[in-house]
């Protein structure tokens, strides 16, 4: 039986994001790029110089890196984005590699409506886990738990994202959503539990909630995982919402504290944190 293609097979081109150097804007090797776009390769075939072959690849790489860098800078200039980037930066042994959506292994293209996908790391994180060969907490809850593009670099979480798939008003938030997944993976707290309200599971609830805090901070509309309008009260009425936010705050206190202080009309974390820690935010 034919295998679904994996599009990244060689060493990648990497551009670290300076405020969080382990967040890496990543681009495939030129040979993988040409192989991914055979029609483009065919149009450049024939008696052409190396420079003529190199130009379209370098131009495409530059455009992608510039666009992702713009999104990351937007996040860095927001309190919500800085909170998530700080959690990622605090674990420098683990990388988050952001790749173009087109290079997502086709085995993962289950839902054409997906705007971004995050794959988990596979290696032990703590000294105890390394000594005993224990997989990271949360890995066993993932259906496939494989880091396709970063098999050459253990400890990397891969995010597949291209902003052309998103509305302009939502493009930053979609990237932040995927970075929340990556942050929880490398923090060792990623795990699935059922969640109602259209979210499916707790991890999508967390990622959507933090994405919407960011949207609200920017005074943009907020919506649930399936696109329905929401407000803070409606989210806190959901079964398990307060329980999950409390768990987030207890397991990731620095993240919770930073997010609770974000000045936004929609911020369910603030409401829970005020009661949990008995503080006035």
PLM region descriptions:
Residues 1-133:
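A metal-dependent hydrolase signature that marks the N-terminal structural subdomain at the beginning
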Residues 2-44, 190-281:
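Active-site or metal-binding loop neighborhoods of secreted/extracellular toxin and effector enzymes
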Residues 65-68, 80-85, 114, 172, ...:
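Short amphipathic alpha-helical segments that mediate assembly, nucleic-acid/protein binding
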Residues 68-71, 171-172, 179, 203-206:
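Stable alpha-helical elements in mature extracytoplasmic
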Residues 77-80, 180-188, 212-219:
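Sec-exported extracytoplasmic/periplasmic mature domains
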Residues 102-172, 182-186:
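Active-site scaffold of zinc-dependent metalloenzymes
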């Amino acid at each position: 039986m034919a295998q679904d293609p994996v599009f990244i097979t060689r060493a990648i081109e990497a551009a670290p994001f300076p405020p969080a150097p382990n967040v890496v804007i990543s681009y495939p090797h030129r040979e993988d790029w040409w192989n991914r776009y055979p029609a483009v390769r065919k149009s450049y075939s024939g008696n052409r110089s190396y420079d003529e072959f190199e130009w379209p690849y370098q131009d495409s790489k530059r455009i992608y890196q510039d666009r992702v860098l713009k999104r990351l800078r937007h996040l860095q200039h927001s309190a919500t984005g800085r909170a998530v980037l700080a959690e990622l930066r605090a674990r420098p042994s683990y990388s988050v590699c952001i790749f173009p959506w087109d290079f997502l292994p086709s085995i993962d293209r289950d839902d054409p409506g997906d705007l971004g996908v995050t794959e988990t790391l596979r290696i032990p994180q703590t000294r105890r886990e390394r000594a005993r060969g224990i997989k990271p907490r949360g890995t066993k809850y993932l259906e496939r738990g494989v880091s396709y593009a970063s098999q050459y670099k253990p400890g990397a979480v891969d995010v597949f994202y291209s902003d052309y798939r998103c509305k302009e008003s939502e493009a930053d938030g979609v990237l932040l959503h995927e970075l929340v997944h990556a942050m929880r993976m490398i923090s060792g707290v990623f795990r699935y539990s059922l969640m109602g309200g259209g979210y499916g599971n707790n991890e999508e609830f967390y990622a959507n909630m933090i994405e919407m805090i960011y949207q609200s901070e920017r005074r943009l509309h907020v919506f649930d995982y399936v696109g329905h309008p929401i407000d803070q009260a409606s989210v806190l009425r959901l079964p398990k919402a307060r329980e999950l936010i409390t768990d987030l705050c207890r397991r990731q206190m620095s993240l919770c504290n930073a997010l609770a202080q974000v000045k936004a009309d929609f911020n369910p974390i603030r409401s829970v944190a005020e009661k949990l820690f008995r503080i006035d935010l």
